[in-house]
Amino acid sequence: MNTADFDFHLPEELIAQTPLEKRDASKLLIVNRETGEMQDKHFHSIIDMLEPGDALVMNDTRVLPARLYGQKVETGGHVELLLLKNTSGDEWEVLAKPAKRLKVGTRISFGDGRLSAVVTEELTHGGRIVRFEYQGIFLEVLESLGEMPLPPYIHEKLDDRERYQTVYAKESGSAAAPTAGLHFTKELLAEIQAKGVHLVYLTLHVGLGTFRPVSVDNLDEHEMHSEFYQLSEEAAATLRSVKKNGGRVIAVGTTSIRTLETIGSKFDGQIQADSGWTNIFIKPGYEWKVVDAFSTNFHLPKSTLVMLVSAFAGRELVLDAYHHSIQEHYRFFSFGDAMFIY
């Protein structure tokens, strides 16, 4: 299959620039992958798609305010860093601007001087490894000095940075939100749990590669970015029990899917506690190991995420669903509406 097979025209006005006032007021397109039937609902009605004994699996990663603005200590020149991932200790892989002026040994100061960094390694495509020096707790310093790294297609400033976090965000480390989870409120989750559905949490720290377009025509040549994931023993045991008793594993978002399917692929279809790095590329032809249904937002044309959804429901049905959503003026991408596929 080629990248062009997953293209579609999206009117720019359908790209949501701000979140809705109420998280669960977004639209929900329900798609039956067996019959092709589609239903237009609101997100709160996702509870009607869940049965007692099912497991709803969510990614509890928390987005770092990972964009930092500073000055080179020697020259005062302006520098922008975007934190990508913690490589070890106080060292981070970052995307730097202007990268060509940031050689090994360059020192950068941020804000009131509580945070500084030194470049320790030069990578390709504007990447650098930097070592941070700071007073106090790094994440607290970052919270006060950093800005939210909103996706490149969002041009509005975010009034409340918590709206780019899920209500259950806990484990700091992402450069982008697991946006399928943004629709859930604490009240809706309590209702779902009261129905007898198991709420299960895993962690996958979302990298900026999630926004990177596929640059090759042949999908077999595409290299996926790596992201860190973790599934606890308690969560794995719950999921094994759900499967054993005939319940479904229902993933919230592509990050939960990639974690579960990475583990299923690694352990021959079994669900085990695990942590590590995954670069799994799920595309049509993939044999599913764990996930029985999922919710997800509407994704960019020709993206690996559209390919993942197509691997589950079939390319033609997914593109039909997207065309339907465009006709019905659904909101797209991170702050947009959702679909539920079963």
UniProtKB/Swiss-Prot annotation:
- Tell me which Gene Ontology terms the entry assigns under biological process: queuosine biosynthetic process; tRNA wobble guanine modification
Query: Its annotated pathway?
Result: tRNA modification; tRNA-queuosine biosynthesis
One cellular-component annotation, GO? cytoplasm
Coiled coil region boundaries: none
Which InterPro entries is this protein grouped with? QueA, QueA_dom1, QueA_dom2, QueA_sf
Q: What is its main location?
A: cytoplasm
Among the Pfam families in the record, one is Queuosine_synth
**HAMAP family xref list:** QueA
Q: Which family does it belong to?
A: Belongs to the QueA family.
What is the protein name for this chain? S-adenosylmethionine:tRNA ribosyltransferase-isomerase
Q: Organism source for this protein?
A: Streptococcus pneumoniae serotype 4 (strain ATCC BAA-334 / TIGR4)
